[in-house]
């Protein structure tokens, strides 16, 4: 007969059986391997030898070093002026007033004063350009005027920049990007001549500009077409007489400068310009007060009997 098992041993055997039935968990041991890297260099902090810029400049002078001062100002280039120094006022009627009248005497006196001021400006221009001759300038100005306007026909803006100033360029090329310009010079009705010469400085006394106003009475043709080829302004085969007062400018202190067209003076007594033709609407039939549009359109479509 078997001997009875004590109660304590039965509980122990039961616990060991449950523990052996559990799945075995395999664990991996983590190994830390040190990696040798490049040692970083941290520069030491040194105290500045010179606390102020003045001490540094004094030490540099003692050592024989000349340090140029740093300029924080930005340089700008002024190739032209933004307007006219002393705008020439064309006399009303283009100086056709009799010199014996009161108005004629006043006009003649003012003209003499302006002539004296022009002579002073001519001498100042010759100080910078010894080859300048006022008698040869009107012909040169006419060539610049013609070539500048011909550049608009083929949209040669690179050449136009050399013939007109930066002030005049936007005025000539404004609103013609998608348009066709047909301009031509026919003839000169009167010889061009200089009516006023002025010189002035800008920003400082060393930046001198010269402006010459030339009177031109010519015959020209002008026609402007829109991007669809429809005529907007003028006619190519109808020449017109044009009286213009053109201002030419040059930066006298620039040894490579040249005379360029700057602006035009429009007198207040000049006739108004021809308005631009609007081609966006087709005009309909003229209606009477008692008619309607449909009735007038039906009558226009009726065949006419012989």
From Swiss-Prot:
Domain of life per record: Eukaryota
Location (main, coarse): mitochondrion
Gene: MRPL45
Intrachain S-S bonds: none
Keyword entries, A-Z: Mitochondrion, Ribonucleoprotein, Ribosomal protein, Transit peptide
Gene Ontology CC annotation, any one: mitochondrial large ribosomal subunit
Gene3D superfamilies reported in the protein's UniProt record: 3.10.450.240
GO molecular function: RNA binding; structural constituent of ribosome
PANTHER family on file: 39S RIBOSOMAL PROTEIN L45, MITOCHONDRIAL, LARGE RIBOSOMAL SUBUNIT PROTEIN ML45
Family: Belongs to the mitochondrion-specific ribosomal protein mL45 family.
Record flagged with keyword Ribosomal protein: yes
Subcellular localization(s) per the UniProt record: Mitochondrion
Keyword Manganese among record annotations: no
Protein name: Large ribosomal subunit protein mL45
Subunit and interaction comment: Component of the mitochondrial large ribosomal subunit (mt-LSU). Mature mammalian 55S mitochondrial ribosomes consist of a small (28S) and a large (39S) subunit. The 28S small subunit contains a 12S ribosomal RNA (12S mt-rRNA) and 30 different proteins. The 39S large subunit contains a 16S rRNA (16S mt-rRNA), a copy of mitochondrial valine transfer RNA (mt-tRNA(Val)), which plays an integral structural role, and 52 different proteins.
Task performed by this protein: Component of the mitochondrial large ribosomal subunit (mt-LSU). Within the mitochondrial ribosomes, required to direct the nascent polypeptide toward the tunnel exit and position the exit at a distance from the membrane surface.
Any one GO BP annotation for this protein: mitochondrial translation
Transmembrane segments: none
Residue span of region Disordered: 287-306
């Amino acid at each position: 007969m078997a001997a009875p098992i004590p109660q304590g041993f039965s509980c122990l055997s039961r616990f060991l059986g449950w523990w052996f039935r559990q799945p075995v968990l395999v664990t991996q041991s983590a190994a830390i391997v040190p990696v040798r890297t490049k040692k970083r260099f941290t520069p030491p902090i040194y105290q500045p030898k010179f606390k102020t810029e003045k001490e540094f400049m004094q030490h540099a002078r003692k050592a024989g070093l000349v340090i140029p001062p740093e300029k924080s100002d930005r340089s700008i280039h002024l190739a032209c002026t933004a307007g006219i120094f002393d705008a020439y006022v064309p006399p009303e009627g283009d100086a056709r007033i009799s010199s014996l009248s009161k108005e004629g005497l006043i006009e003649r006196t003012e003209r003499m004063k302006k002539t004296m001021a022009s002579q002073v400006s001519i001498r100042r221009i010759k100080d910078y350009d010894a080859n300048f001759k006022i008698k040869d300038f009107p012909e040169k100005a006419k060539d610049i005027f013609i070539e500048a306007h011909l550049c608009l026909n083929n949209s040669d803006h690179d050449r136009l920049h050399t013939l007109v100033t930066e002030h005049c360029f936007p005025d000539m090329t404004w609103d013609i990007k998608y348009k066709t310009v047909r301009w031509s010079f026919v003839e000169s009705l009167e010889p061009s001549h200089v009516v006023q010469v002025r010189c002035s400085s800008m920003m400082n006394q060393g930046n001198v500009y010269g402006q010459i106003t030339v009177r031109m009475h010519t015959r020209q043709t002008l026609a402007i077409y829109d991007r669809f080829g429809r005529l907007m302004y003028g006619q190519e085969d109808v020449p017109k007489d044009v009286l213009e007062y053109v201002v030419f400018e040059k930066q006298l202190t620039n040894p490579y400068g040249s005379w360029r067209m700057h602006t035009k003076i429009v007198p207040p007594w000049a006739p108004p310009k021809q308005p631009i033709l609007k081609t966006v609407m087709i005009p309909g039939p003229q209606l009477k007060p008692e008619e309607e549009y449909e009735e007038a359109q039906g009558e226009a479509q009726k065949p006419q009997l012989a």
